[in-house]
Amino acid sequence: MLNKIYDTQKEGCEKAIASLKRDFTTLRTGKVNINILDNVMVDYYGSPTPLNQVATVLTSDASTIAITPWEKSMIKAISSAIQAANIGVNPNSDGESVKLFFPPMTVEQRQENAKHAKAMGEKAKVSIRNVRKDANDEVKKLEKDKAITEDESKKGQDEVQKITDTYTAKIDTLVKEKEAELLKI
């Protein structure tokens, strides 16, 4: 009974960490990462479509992303979608492809991104605390329904807290690593 609650809690915590890692890919570091374009949606014949489903996206060097659409007619739509995504660069088109040139990041930009990383980490911790609350509520409900004793309930809540502490520490580590990566020149 309690093991099922622990497993559900761990699953919820893993989802929070996966979400945090996904959020981190949107932060720009010193070198270009094509994941910064993951949330760019292109108008493809009237329906919003992820950029990577209408074009090949590659990094050509440490500061440039090259986007080659599968249909040349999509260049204008891709450029518009990138501008609308507000990722901090203007697309340059040569008629065949779209290139994104990322200027070197300033110290202020790096510090701002580090703040964003910390805020993302806090959001993930809130998610984990919500998962902990749900798990504790389930343990207390079992005790109230006389399915477990008061001692088992206390042990169960202690285990829920240990799981929470473990995942909170993982988030702290991920945030510290991301901050170090962002602030590294």
Swiss-Prot record:
The keyword Cytoplasm applies. Gene3D superfamilies: 3.30.1360.40, Ribosome-recycling factor. CDD domains: RRF. Keywords: Cytoplasm, Protein biosynthesis. The keyword Protein biosynthesis applies. GO terms for molecular function: ribosomal large subunit binding. It is found in: Cytoplasm. GO terms for biological process: cytoplasmic translational termination. One of its GO terms (cellular component) is cytosol. It comes from the Bacteria. InterPro entries: Ribosome_recyc_fac, Ribosome_recyc_fac_dom, RRF_sf. Belongs to the RRF family. Responsible for the release of ribosomes from messenger RNA at the termination of protein biosynthesis. May increase the efficiency of translation by recycling ribosomes from one round of translation to another. This is Ribosome-recycling factor. It comes from Campylobacter concisus (strain 13826).
